[in-house]
Amino acid sequence: TFSSIQIDINKTMKPFYSVLEYFYDYGYMGVPMFFTISGYVFAYVYLNKKEKTSGRQFFINRFARLYPLHFTTLIIVTLLQITSYKFTDSFQIYFFNDIYHFFLHLFFINGWGFQDGTSFNQPIWTVSLEVIVYALFFITIPYLNKFGIKFIIILYLALLLIDKSGIQREWTDIESLLNSCAKLFYSGIFVFYL
């Protein structure tokens, strides 16, 4: 059929498709795995520690791990987009590459619903949402330490209820994605407790 031919044509147009086929076809599965593994790792590092981690230290640790790579890739992608625009009069892949969207990326808020469309290093939207989930995690550490898996089950059921209640239909994409990311993150913590 025409649609299957069109799909094959689109696949072959992707850069290095023959070598990167697996990542093109199944790469989307990495995002849920990323959130779930992050939840597990955070539980391992921060829960039931004898020494409490201060909020300041927690967020300094997060910033130190995330920001250097984020900033480096943002600069590289920006330079590549400028080069592309100079030689082809067009940006590549993501087209909202202006100063406004640069600052959204710079401050890790490009996935929070302020954007007009995809821009610069768009896959970083996952990390911009994870920053919110990190804050939620830090706030819930005392409850996780006190109630353990019971707290996760209640939190997860509340998030699931929000999903199934229809409330989410009124939400923006960011709120819906944030709910999904939180469920995946806390699923990783659930696995930690098992």
Where are these regions (language model features)?
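Functionally critical transmembrane alpha-helices in membrane proteins and complexes, commonly lining
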Residues: 1-47, 67-70, 105-109, 180
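Residue-level signal for alpha-helical transmembrane segments in multi-pass membrane proteins
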Residues: 3, 41-44, 76-84, 140, ...
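Transmembrane helix-loop junctions in multipass membrane proteins, especially transporters and channels
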Residues: 5, 48-50, 82-90, 146-149, ...
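Juxtamembrane loop-helix boundary motifs flanking transmembrane segments in multi-pass membrane proteins
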Residues: 11, 15-18, 51-55, 59, ...
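Transmembrane alpha-helical segments and their boundary/interface "anchor" motifs
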Residues: 28-31, 46-83, 93-104, 133, ...
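Conserved beta-strand->loop/alpha-helix structural units within folded catalytic cores of enzymes
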Residues: 33-38, 66-71, 129-142
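Hydrophobic alpha-helical segments of integral membrane proteins
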Residues: 34-36, 42-43, 47, 72-77, ...
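Aromatic-enriched alpha-helical transmembrane segments of multi-pass intramembrane proteins
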Residues: 97-194
